Structures are given as structure tokens and as C-alpha cells.
């Protein structure tokens, strides 16, 4: 990463949640220092309740670190902004809006002309494979289709960094596998700096350029970093894939 542009940098980020008027303090993150280069697909992996979602929310500007700082293109992150797009585990679509309406919402709020925003939204509807569903409402869509809308909406707003918080955690195994394939395909077509959070090592190896693991207890601390030098598209049954997955599983003591 020596000659590559650093897009996101976390410097000694720590987070303590306070309860009962500050009488109870819960340390969630401790001394997280991390750099993500432009167009890198970074996956943060760890078990539940290890602080990885909190770290993503701090990068998004939705949480403030207790100590430390986050920088985007060298500028300190002080709150949410259009330069970061986020896809959540729970579906966050507007139920009264169609697929087209949901995807173009951010562009509309930004004052973009209708013709232009429809053109952009249409491009991403096509990219995520939802042609023919432009006029469908969220209640008419499957879970996988809803997340495709969420991903298309995030891409349509053209953020500098895309943040995904266990976006496939609520999907069945088959749909989750298909969405992993779609995510890898879309990223290959529309290169973007991506930070993806998951508790699945298998998913991490399939998607990542680099994997960062967090310890499985609070406060979350960085444990290891792995560069994934496997060709794309990847196959879960390839020898090299299985060897890397096994190595990470053994070294992090996480169960698949």
C-alpha cells in the first residue's frame, strides 16, 4: 500500500458507552488504528458483540469516538456526510416509495434534475438486476431484493466510501450466497472503497482484498490483518480459498 492513496484512516480510535448517568462505563473499542486505501475492499470480521459495528458507525460519523480520530481524504470526520454511503443489516427502505423512488431519493434531495436522477437510478437498477421492478414497493420484494435496492441507492449517491454492516445477516443461506456474488460483481464493475463488516470468515475471504479481524471480546481490538491474493471471481471450494479460510479460522479461534 506504499504508493496507494489512503482513503480512510482511523487513529487510535476508542469508544466507551456510558449508562446510568455515566456511573456504568462499557469499553467497546480500544486503540483501533487502521488505514484503507482507495478502491480497496476491506472486510472487518469478528464474532457478535466485538465492536465491529460500532467502528463502522464511527467511520460513518453516526457515533463519536471517545478518543482518537477518523480521517477521510486527510480531513477529520466529525459527522455523517454524503461522502459515505451506508447499507445496514436491517432494511432501511422507505415503504411508501417504489424501487425507483428509493434509489433516486438522495439525488432528489440534492436537487438533481428528474431526468438525470432517473438515468442514474436506472443504471444502478440494471446493475443490481432489478429491471422490471422499478415500480414495485418494498413489501413486494424479497429480502435479497430489498438489499439490492439498498446497495443500488448507496452507489447511486456516488459516495467516496461505501460502508456495509452485515448486510446479508438476515438472509437465508442460498440468498446470502447469491448476494455475495452480486456484491463482488458490482464492486468489480464500479470500483469503490468498501468497508464491509461480517461475522463470517467464509464471506470475508470471498469478498475481500484484505481482512482485518477483531478480538472476540470487549473492548474490541485489532488482532490480525490478511491480504487476500486470490483471483476473482472466487470459488468457495477452491483449494487456496479453503486453506486461507482454515488459516484465519484457526488463528482467530472463530467458528464458521
Where are these regions (language model features)?
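The feature captures the beta-strand-to-loop junction immediately N-terminal to the Walker
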Residues: 45-47
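Helix-to-loop junction immediately C-terminal to a conserved catalytic motif
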Residues: 60
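Conserved ABC transporter NBD signature motif
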Residues: 68-80
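Short helical segment in ABC ATPase nucleotide-binding domains corresponding to the A-loop/adjacent helical element
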Residues: 100-108, 118, 227
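Conserved ABC ATPase "signature" region
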Residues: 108, 113-133, 185
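Conserved signature/switch motifs of ABC ATPase nucleotide-binding domains
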Residues: 136-139, 157
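Hydrophobic anchor residue at the start of the ABC signature
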Residues: 151
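Catalytic Walker B motif of ABC-type/P-loop ATPase nucleotide-binding domains
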Residues: 162-165
Amino acid at each position: 500500500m506504499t504508493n496507494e492513496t489512503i482513503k480512510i484512516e482511523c487513529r487510535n480510535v476508542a469508544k466507551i458507552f456510558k449508562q446510568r448517568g455515566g456511573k456504568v462505563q462499557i469499553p467497546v473499542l480500544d486503540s483501533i488504528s487502521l488505514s484503507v486505501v482507495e478502491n480497496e475492499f476491506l472486510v472487518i470480521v469478528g464474532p457478535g458483540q466485538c465492536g465491529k459495528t460500532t467502528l463502522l458507525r464511527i467511520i460513518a460519523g453516526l457515533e463519536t469516538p471517545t478518543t482518537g480520530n477518523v480521517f477521510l481524504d486527510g480531513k477529520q470526520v466529525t459527522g455523517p456526510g454524503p461522502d459515505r454511503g451506508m447499507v445496514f443489516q436491517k432494511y432501511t427502505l422507505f415503504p411508501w416509495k417504489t424501487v425507483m423512488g428509493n434509489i433516486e431519493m438522495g439525488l432528489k434531495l440534492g436537487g438533481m434534475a428528474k431526468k438525470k436522477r432517473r438515468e442514474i437510478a436506472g443504471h444502478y437498477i440494471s446493475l443490481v438486476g432489478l429491471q422490471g421492478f422499478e415500480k414495485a414497493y418494498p413489501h413486494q420484494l424479497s429480502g435479497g431484493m430489498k438489499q439490492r435496492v439498498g446497495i443500488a441507492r448507496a452507489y447511486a449517491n456516488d459516495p467516496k466510501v461505501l460502508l456495509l454492516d452485515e448486510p446479508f445477516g438476515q438472509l437465508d443461506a442460498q440468498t446470502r450466497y447469491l448476494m455475495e456474488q452480486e456484491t463482488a460483481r458490482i464492486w468489480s464493475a464500479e470500483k469503490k472503497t468498501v468497508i464491509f463488516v461480517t461475522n463470517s470468515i467464509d464471506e470475508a475471504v470471498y469478498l475481500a482484498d484484505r481482512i482485518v479481524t477483531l478480538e472476540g471480546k470487549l473492548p474490541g481490538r485489532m488482532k490480525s490483518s490478511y491480504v487476500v491474493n486470490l483471483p476473482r471471481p472466487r470459488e468457495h471450494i477452491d483449494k487456496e480459498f479453503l486453506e486461507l479460510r482454515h488459516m484465519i479460522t484457526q488463528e482467530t479461534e472463530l467458528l464458521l
